From Swiss-Prot:
Keywords: Kelch repeat, Repeat
Annotated ranges, domain BTB: 36-104
Kelch repeat positions: 274-320, 321-369, 370-416, 418-466, 467-508, 510-557
Pfam assignment, any one: BTB
Superkingdom of the source species: Eukaryota
Protein's UniProt name: Kelch-like protein 23
InterPro entries tied to this protein: BACK (IPR011705), BTB-kelch_protein (IPR017096), BTB/POZ_dom (IPR000210), BTB_POZ_KLHL23 (IPR030566), Kelch-typ_b-propeller (IPR015915), Kelch_1 (IPR006652), KLHL23_BACK (IPR047068), SKP1/BTB/POZ_sf (IPR011333)
Cystine crosslinks: none
Domain BACK intervals: 139-240
Keyword check for Repeat: yes
Repeat in keyword set: yes
CDD domains assigned to the protein according to its UniProt record, in alphabetical order: BACK_KLHL23 (cd18462), BTB_POZ_KLHL23 (cd18252)
Amino acid sequence: MALKGQEDYIYLFKDSTHPVDFLDAFRTFYLDGLFTDITLQCPSGIIFHCHRAVLAACSNYFKAMFTADMKEKFKNKIKLSGIHHDILEGLVNYAYTSQIEITERNVQSLLEAADLLQFLSVKKACERFLVRHLDIDNCIGMHSFAEFHVCPELEKESRRILCSKFKEVWQQEEFLEISLEKFLFILSRKNLSVWKEEAIIEPVIKWTAHDVENRIECLCNLLSYINIDVDPVYLKTALGLQRSCLFTENKIRSLIYNALNPMHKEISQRSTATMYIIGGYYWHPLSEVHIWDPLTNVWIQGAEIPDYTRESYGVTCLGPNIYVTGGYRTDNIEALDTVWIYNSESDEWTEGLPTLNARYYHCAVTLGGCVYALGGYRKGAPAEEAEFYDPLKEKWIPIANMIKGVGNATACVLHDVIYVIGGHCGYRGSCTYDKVQSYNSDINEWSLITSSPHPEYGLCSVPLENKLYLVGGQTTITECYDPEQNEWREIAPMMERRMECGAVIMNGCIYVTGGYPYSKGTYLQSIEKYDPDLNKWEIVGNLPSAMRSHGCVCVYNV
């Protein structure tokens, strides 16, 4: 009882279990057929007895149907065409449980139904599922699917793969069946990743030759969208070599003239990718993020890493996000399990879910829409444990242990296989490992496939043109590995020795950044570029500061 002259005593009771109990009660009503007031019928004839209020609360489609002046408002049975009963059952169960199972088999049908019936949360979950499973062999179809159903994230990320890996994409069977409009859309992208004439002429010829009778008249239109110089001799030869494209000399000459008419063309360089330098070490840990466009040779600075005292972390890129995993702090060598994620589009950092195993000097790569953390050091000894982060499930998942735990090794992905090369093994890195370990995610198995010609640690590896390149280390030796032939070959040596450098592929070339040449005892600031066509290295610029042990990744512009 309140004292005289004071406000009434108020106690606000809030039952935290009420929302769950409330939903459970309606679930029971649904299962028992109690208080139902609407029936949904599939084309197969299967019916579901539901509650209008529950459907309207989850679906804008049903909310509009039951509140607007529509004939269905007064009906007790609603017939829904074009929706399989399994899909409708899943959506109805979601309305009563807040859960729905999404699989590779049902995801597209489920998204279509969720889009139609405006179950917006389910549609978004399906969209994220499809983004998680994007690859070169489905990105064209997914891009069209995303455009039709207005899925902005799926559209953007499928376009990112389509443009950044165009050479691999056009060699897929799916490419031959695309429409002229879709092909023109691809060619018109300013960020289409092409760096050779044949890289863009070949798919045009291949697509035309696939259905030459119906597509031959499209050829001139396609060529007019190519924003690079086209060699008339090369074009004539390419057309002539396609036996299904048999033209008269006049027809070839006409095609060449129209395609190369400057009134129809805009010759320009394509800005396809941007290099991100994350942190690093220069006598102390660095926390800066530096962003470089190789076309303009301009550096800009991004938001700094929030945890600025750590070093020897793993860095990898997944879509627009850059993941920084593990490492250790300067004042001790205790391995960390912390994860920071940098969004390159918003220039913002967020803290991610900690890894299952703390580690430093480990390898980090992306494969199949997931982020992998492999090996590294923990308590002075190389770790065999490996794990991956599934951004859809928002959890780290352990995988099979590596055959040999290694620290300060290098890893990259080629044809959906992870390769881990070299590194230190033994307590506190007492010896160097000479084997190449490969991981097949389909069977969750590691294998030893070959030996490195010169075992080292502190190297970088990158995939290019179906081959794996080893750069950096204590020498200037650069080597190329062909997995199909299981052969190594030495290529042109680098200009500098670069221990713990960074390396990335951009526009068909290898860029190697910074590093530490033990012979000189200084940190490097320069950037070397390797052109595989010329088999030649050259200095093409400088980092904002000298550094080693930094993250170096490429984000493709969309």
